[in-house]
């Protein structure tokens, strides 16, 4: 009888594991294929060969790229080369990506940039916030951008127990930001278990020199984050839940959920079109291809435009889609004056004139 009970319990456990694996495949959209939506006047950006996970563009047309991200278990085309920050002047006729110099004293060898955000202070000082994973740890670096020298002056490294697995960031002050944690744990194995068990322990944290606090939680895997043009709302992408959350920002910097937009793709980073307030989303149509890399069946790319996200039925349009033959694993799309930049997790980056 004891053996029969043991076999029964083992069978239940295997059934539970099987159900969880099936659920994970569904969260990864493992069977989805994408139909191409091409754009004219596009070319790959020279000098970006191993990913440009995030892009942020200043009002004057200077675009910043975080390049060379490496994550445990994720493919890399340049595994031994440290990451960096590139800049492109979109006001120029034929813009090129140039790497910014970083001030002495900053550890360039372990630089592993992820999400980025800019903040312009009242005196026109430009700060660049960078999520960094040196040796796969979690920090936020604050730089001052020195335009005349094409350089970044490192000001501060931020570490905190409430920032265990930082993914993206939106700056709201010279030393103030909201950040997403895509996992509750920092250990790679515990992260895997957290994802496999679908625990929904990811969150959003507000950081200031005076206060650090969790302001939203219950996400499957909180990823991209941005702010509305009127600064009233925070947008958060939940990549494995295929959702964009709209959260209302309060004077004490707390957030309350206003609505959730469900999509049929894995939503990564979010950018705002400054001319319209529309949200541009870099997406992964098939997450399994992203994490299990096959050069003969590479991950595809998809960019969505979301108009009027606050209304009952926002308009969602596919701006660009590719099966991986041109661009693999799109993670971000940013626009400036009818010029579109599309970055990827670990592949190339695309420049298009709309």
UniProtKB/Swiss-Prot annotation:
Reactions this protein catalyses: a phenyl acetate + H2O = a phenol + acetate + H(+); an N-acyl-L-homoserine lactone + H2O = an N-acyl-L-homoserine + H(+)
Active site: 114
Entry's EC annotation: 3.1.1.2, 3.1.1.81
Subcellular location: Membrane
Gene3D superfamilies in the record: TolB, C-terminal domain (2.120.10.30)
Class of this enzyme: hydrolase
Annotated disulfide bonds: 42-352
Keyword Ribonucleoprotein: no
Keyword tags: Calcium, Disulfide bond, Glycoprotein, Hydrolase, Membrane, Metal-binding, Signal
Binding site for Ca(2+) 2: 54, 116, 168
Principal subcellular localization: membrane
Membrane topology, record value: Peripheral membrane protein
Annotated binding of Ca(2+) 1, by residue: 53, 167, 223, 268-269
Glycosylation sites: 254, 269, 323
Post-translational modification: Glycosylated.
Cofactor binding comment, as recorded: Binds 2 calcium ions per subunit.
GO cellular component terms, A-Z: extracellular region; membrane
One Gene Ontology term of the molecular function aspect: acyl-L-homoserine-lactone lactonohydrolase activity
Name of a matching Pfam family: Arylesterase
Cofactor(s) for this UniProt protein: Ca(2+)
GO biological process: response to toxic substance
UniProt function note: Capable of hydrolyzing lactones and a number of aromatic carboxylic acid esters.
Family: Belongs to the paraoxonase family.
PANTHER family per the UniProt record, alphabetical: PARAOXONASE (PTHR11799), SERUM PARAOXONASE_ARYLESTERASE 2 (PTHR11799:SF17)
Record protein name field: Serum paraoxonase/arylesterase 2
């Amino acid at each position: 009888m004891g053996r029969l009970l043991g076999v029964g319990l083992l069978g239940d456990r295997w059934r539970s594991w099987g159900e969880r694996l099936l659920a994970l495949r569904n969260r990864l959209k493992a069977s989805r294929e994408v139909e191409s939506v091409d754009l004219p006047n596009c070319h790959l950006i020279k000098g970006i060969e191993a990913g440009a996970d995030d892009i942020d563009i200043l009002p004057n047309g200077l675009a910043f790229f975080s390049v060379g991200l490496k994550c445990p278990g994720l493919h890399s085309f340049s595994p031994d080369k440290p990451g960096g920050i590139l800049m492109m002047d979109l006001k120029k006729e034929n813009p090129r990506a140039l790497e910014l110099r970083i001030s002495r004293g900053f550890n360039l060898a372990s630089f592993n940039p992820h999400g980025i955000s800019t903040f312009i202070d009242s005196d026109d000082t430009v700060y660049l916030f960078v999520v960094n994973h040196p040796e796969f740890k979690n920090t936020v670096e604050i730089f001052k951008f020195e335009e005349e020298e094409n350089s970044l002056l490192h000001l501060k490294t931020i570490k905190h127990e409430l920032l265990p697995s930082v993914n993206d960031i939106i700056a709201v002050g010279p030393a103030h930001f909201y950040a997403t944690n895509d996992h509750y744990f920092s250990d790679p194995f515990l992260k895997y278990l957290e994802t496999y068990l679908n625990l929904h322990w990811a969150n959003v944290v507000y950081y200031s020199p005076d206060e650090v606090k969790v302001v939203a939680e219950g996400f499957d895997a909180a990823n991209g984050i941005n702010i509305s043009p009127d600064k009233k709302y925070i947008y958060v992408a939940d990549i494995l839940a295929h959702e964009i959350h709209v959260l209302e920002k309060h004077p004490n910097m707390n957030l309350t959920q206003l609505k959730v937009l469900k999509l049929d793709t894995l939503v990564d980073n979010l950018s705002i079109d400054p001319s319209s307030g529309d949200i541009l989303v870099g997406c992964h149509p098939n997450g399994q291809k992203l994490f299990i890399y096959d050069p003969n069946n590479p991950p595809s790319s998809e960019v969505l435009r979301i108009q009027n996200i606050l209304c009952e039925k926002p308009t969602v349009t596919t701006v660009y889609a590719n099966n991986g033959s041109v661009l693999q694993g799109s993670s971000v799309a940013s626009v400036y004056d009818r010029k579109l930049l599309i970055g990827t997790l670990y592949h190339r980056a695309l420049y298009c004139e709309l």
